[in-house]
Amino acid sequence: MDTNTSGEELLAKARKPYTITKQRERWTEDEHERFLEALRLYGRAWQRIEEHIGTKTAVQIRSHAQKFFTKLEKEAEVKGIPVCQALDIEIPPPRPKRKPNTPYPRKPGNNGTSSSQVSSAKDAKLVSSASSSQLNQAFLDLEKMPFSEKTSTGKENQDENCSGVSTVNKYPLPTKQVSGDIETSKTSTVDNAVQDVPKKNKDKDGNDGTTVHSMQNYPWHFHADIVNGNIAKCPQNHPSGMVSQDFMFHPMREETHGHANLQATTASATTTASHQAFPACHSQDDYRSFLQISSTFSNLIMSTLLQNPAAHAAATFAASVWPYASVGNSGDSSTPMSSSPPSITAIAAATVAAATAWWASHGLLPVCAPAPITCVPFSTVAVPTPAMTEMDTVENTQPFEKQNTALQDQNLASKSPASSSDDSDETGVTKLNADSKTNDDKIEEVVVTAAVHDSNTAQKKNLVDRSSCGSNTPSGSDAETDALDKMEKDKEDVKETDENQPDVIELNNRKIKMRDNNSNNNATTDSWKEVSEEGRIAFQALFARERLPQSFSPPQVAENVNRKQSDTSMPLAPNFKSQDSCAADQEGVVMIGVGTCKSLKTRQTGFKPYKRCSMEVKESQVGNINNQSDEKVCKRLRLEGEAST
């Protein structure tokens, strides 16, 4: 036994010593009886049980109750009887727990409080997720909802519901404001549109005043009806010498002048310097064909200009001034083309204008009667050229001063005077083709002829095309032979009809002289140098005066010439009244020829512009006699023009 005790002591010594810091709680029998009485009376109200016992604290009472209840349950399980029957005591249910201030997720449906809380949360979620179009209605429905559900569930539920309502209050007000802004902006836009519509209608109704005036001031102004393809109410400004696209594809005259009040304005507009940069095209196909023709002709001019560097430099310099000066009547050139650099079309236009100024001043173009052609000429080249007769109006004077330099550097060889005995084969055949077209195309083609004449011979042969003035090949070519045959046939026709006319006899003599000169293709070029030297003197005189001789023409001269220009602005159009237009064309040709012949006599004595302008007025009346005699030539022109299309 001692050994055991000694062994126990050894084991006790081996353990780590510990101290009891808290006195173990001891319940007396009296305290336990009062505890049981308080449970029957108050249940789990520990503070009241504390007051009933009087010697123990609430914490101690609760701890004692936990131990006591656990002991009772174990005893009941051992005995197999319910706790309430073993002891005459009913264990009170646990007190409901306090809801924490932070609403963390917990199981729903524990009591009525949580269900009301979930329903209020669902209401707030439905309102906040509504679309912008239904947000105001949802907000009104939320305002009508009773608040009994929200206010009866305690402090925490009230806080949550208020937060939900506040979120709803945040959204509809700015949405309402934004929608109001949108509505006001739409309303203002509609108001502006309504205010703009009468203005536009007023502009359309005032066609006879404002629209025509703007079209005269701005040459590249397109009426709104042109874009839609309706040309009936839009007057066309057809500059003299230019055949419009309308007459090529829509030959009816009533289409272009549908508005009766605008015919007089249109007729007067053709006499000004306002030109359409592009003829009106009624469809995309017409526009594509027009662009193809104009680009082909412009490329031809540019190729010849590039082969002659001096002519190209002069034409570029003149073209840089051309778009600004060609506006004519307008005080401000606010067109899109005015700010663009010189283009191919502008260079070609400047070259043509320079040649026109020279021929109008000196009359260096010996004119013969028009010959029949086999192809439709380039009548729709979009070059803003001025009027191509001798007498131009005052508006065209400023571009000529700048553009006469282009012709200086292009050799004037191919434009030799008709009075000299060594007119070359090139100029004769070129004039033959040029006279069969409008005055506009005549000037352009001879300019191209001059440039091609200065280029290489191999490139001359590549440019053989009768419709585009490529007939200036050597005299042995087939193109020139055909052209000469047609010239002889036409000369015989003119002799049959106009044998008694002195002017026509003189023209025929000139054609015979040109035909005889075809064999003298290698003649000397001394007279050409004299012409170019004289041209330099003339240009210096022009620049010193800063005015051209056309600006000194009297008003009645401009009226007579412009009346003939409006007649000759639409020749060679198929299915059109080609008889009248051809008669007018013949009249213009005779007028140019007579004026040229008379002015060449005074060429050797100096530069005399005033006599030339006055003589043209007298001799322009001579061409009226030839109107009836040229019907045969006009019919041949029309038939061959139709056959080539």
Curated annotation (Swiss-Prot):
Changes seen on gene knockout: Shorter circadian oscillations. The double mutant cca1 lhy accumulates higher levels of JMJ14 but lower levels of ATXR3/SDG2, and exhibits damped H3K4me3 levels near the transcription start sites of genic regions.
Residue ranges with Polar residues bias: 110-120, 159-169, 468-478
Record carries keyword Repressor: no
Ranges of residues in domain HTH myb-type: 19-73
Tissue specificity as recorded in UniProt: Expressed in leaves, roots, stems, flowers and siliques.
Location relative to the cell: Nucleus
One MF term in the entry's GO annotations: DNA-binding transcription factor activity
GO BP term, example: regulation of circadian rhythm
Keywords from the UniProt entry: Biological rhythms, DNA-binding, Nucleus, Phosphoprotein, Transcription, Transcription regulation
Region (Disordered) location: 89-127, 149-212, 410-437, 458-500
Residues bearing PTM Phosphoserine: 6
The organism's place on the tree of life at top rank: Eukaryota
Basic and acidic residues composition bias: residue spans: 149-158, 197-207, 483-498
InterPro entries associated with the record: Homeodomain-like_sf, Myb_dom, Myb_dom_plants, SANT/Myb, SANT_dom
Feature: DNA-binding region: 46-69
UniProt GO cellular component terms: nucleus
Induction conditions: Circadian-regulation with peak levels occurring around 1 hour after dawn. Up-regulated by APRR1/TOC1 and transiently by light treatment. Down-regulated by APRR5, APRR7 and APRR9.
Note: CCA1 and LHY are only partially redundant, but they bind to the same region of the promoters.
The protein's assembly and partners: Homodimer or heterodimer with CCA1. Interacts with CCA1 (via internal domain); independently of photoperiod. Functions probably as part of a large complex. Interacts with CKB1 and CKB3. Interacts with LNK1 and LNK2.
PANTHER family xref list: PROTEIN LHY, SWI/SNF COMPLEX-RELATED
Function, in words: Transcription factor involved in the circadian clock. Binds to the promoter region of APRR1/TOC1 and TCP21/CHE to repress their transcription. Represses both CCA1 and itself. May recognize the promoter of JMJ14 to regulates its expression during the night in a circadian manner.
The protein's name: Protein LHY
Organism whose genome encodes this protein: Arabidopsis thaliana
Gene name of this polypeptide: LHY
